[in-house]
Amino acid sequence: MRIGHGYDVHRFCDGDFITLGGVRIPHKYGLLAHSDGDVLLHALSDALLGAAGLGDIGKHFPDTDPQFKGADSRVLLRHVVGIVQAKGWKVGNVDATIVAQAPKMSPHIETMRQRIAEDLQVELDQVNVKATTTEKLGFTGREEGIAVHAVALLLPA
């Protein structure tokens, strides 16, 4: 078995929604990114790649490559799952923590879990997503952006 950790951050920019866990969430800002800015799926992708010893999403989907401009992070995550499986691994479980002062995440977490489980080809109880604030401290507390920590357990296929 292997464990991987992923971390990602995106800065807020002009916009009226963010995408997290494949869910479009109305917000007073958007997220600045080369792809769709889904910081949750980016952190999960990094955790999976790290556990399999396959580098990170920047290696597989460089932000200098125009083919990934505006890319759907669910498509990228499914690709990551495919290369992890090709190396002889399957997902045991994943756990992620969204760090954001706003928007409120609780109304969206179950849908995020469902979409992630679908993309990872696992049962819903193998996916956990939670959210916390930093009590208005730091860049997330000042509502400058969102961060996500994620861990993944891989098992031999």
Swiss-Prot record:
Indicate the transmembrane segments per the record.
none
One GO MF term on file is: 2-C-methyl-D-erythritol 2,4-cyclodiphosphate synthase activity
Asked if Metal-binding is a keyword of the record, the answer is yes
Q: Which coenzymes or cofactors are required?
A: a divalent metal cation
Pathway(s) per entry: Isoprenoid biosynthesis; isopentenyl diphosphate biosynthesis via DXP pathway; isopentenyl diphosphate from 1-deoxy-D-xylulose 5-phosphate: step 4/6
How many and how are cofactors bound here? Answer: Binds 1 divalent metal cation per subunit.
Biological processes per GO annotation: isopentenyl diphosphate biosynthetic process, methylerythritol 4-phosphate pathway; terpenoid biosynthetic process
Q: Which residue positions hold the site described Transition state stabilizer?
A: H34, T133
Q: What reaction is this protein's catalytic activity? A: 4-CDP-2-C-methyl-D-erythritol 2-phosphate = 2-C-methyl-D-erythritol 2,4-cyclic diphosphate + CMP
Instruction: Quote the EC number.
Output: 4.6.1.12
Q: Where does 4-CDP-2-C-methyl-D-erythritol 2-phosphate bind?
A: 8-10, 34-35, 56-58, 61-65, 132-135, 139, 142
The reply to whether Cell wall biogenesis/degradation figures as a keyword in the UniProt entry is no
Q: What does this protein do?
A: Involved in the biosynthesis of isopentenyl diphosphate (IPP) and dimethylallyl diphosphate (DMAPP), two major building blocks of isoprenoid compounds. Catalyzes the conversion of 4-diphosphocytidyl-2-C-methyl-D-erythritol 2-phosphate (CDP-ME2P) to 2-C-methyl-D-erythritol 2,4-cyclodiphosphate (ME-CPP) with a corresponding release of cytidine 5-monophosphate (CMP).
NCBIfam families attached to this UniProt entry: ispF
HAMAP family recorded: IspF (MF_00107)
Binding partners and assembly: Homotrimer.
Q: Which family does it belong to?
A: Belongs to the IspF family.
Question: Per its record, how is this protein called by name?
Answer: 2-C-methyl-D-erythritol 2,4-cyclodiphosphate synthase
